[in-house]
């Protein structure tokens, strides 16, 4: 029988293995194209990354894991999470449990396009993010497309995700 902790540890391990291997392939390689002229690729973590974690009727903690773990491995300094509250105004306990296990502290109780706009422009409480990740409904997708000239997004959701 699996406990929640065992399941989390298994998922965490699998996601980490994949992204750590991916990071190995991004080593800085330089070439000298002409005597004294060197070109190279350099990869740096995003300082402030925003993660949208859908909630409401079906909190997607798996999306949280698949977004947060790569951000942690990459070395992002600040991880901002926006997730909608349930009908009682509370964040789903599973989302909070995962956040605690991953040591993610900046969680905001806001969903939909409001969360995307908040992470894009910043608010009194939500820091402005440099890149935003995460799935969502058609409103979240449209909001991400609208702000894509202001902030980096991973990509709009496909038809199977909306």
Language model region names:
Residues 26-29, 77-87, 91-94, 105-106, ...:
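Glycine/threonine-rich beta-strand-loop-alpha-helix active-site module
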Residues 1-47:
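N-terminal Rossmann-like NAD(P)+-binding subdomain of aldehyde/semialdehyde dehydrogenases
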Residues 12, 16, 65-72, 80, ...:
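Predominant activation on well-ordered alpha-helical scaffold segments within soluble catalytic domains
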Residues 32-97:
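Conserved small-residue-rich beta-alpha loop and adjacent elements
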Residues 17-24, 51, 73, 104, ...:
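Alpha-helix capping at helix-to-loop junctions
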Residues 20-28, 50-54, 130-138:
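Short, mixed-charge, low-aromatic patches
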Residues 101-162:
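Conserved NAD(P)+-binding/catalytic subdomain of aldehyde/semialdehyde dehydrogenases
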Residues 1-15, 42, 64, 88, ...:
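Generic structural signal for well-ordered, non-membrane alpha-helical segments
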């Amino acid at each position: 029988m699996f406990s929640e902790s065992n399941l989390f540890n298994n998922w965490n391990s699998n996601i980490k293995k994949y992204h750590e291997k991916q990071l190995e392939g991004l080593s800085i390689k330089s070439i000298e194209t002409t005597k004294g002229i060197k070109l190279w690729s350099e990869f740096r973590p995003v300082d402030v990354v925003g993660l949208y974690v859908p909630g409401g009727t079906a909190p997607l903690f798996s999306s949280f894991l698949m977004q947060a773990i790569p951000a942690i491995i990459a070395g992002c300094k600040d991880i901002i999470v926006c997730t909608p509250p349930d009908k009682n105004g509370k964040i789903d306990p599973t989302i909070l449990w995962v956040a605690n296990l991953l040591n993610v502290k900046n969680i905001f109780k806001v969903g939909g396009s409001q969360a995307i706009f908040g992470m894009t422009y910043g608010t009194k409480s939500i820091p402005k993010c440099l890149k935003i990740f995460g799935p969502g409904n058609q409103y979240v997708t449209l909001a991400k497309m609208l702000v894509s000239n202001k902030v980096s997004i991973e990509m709009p959701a496909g038809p199977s995700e909306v």
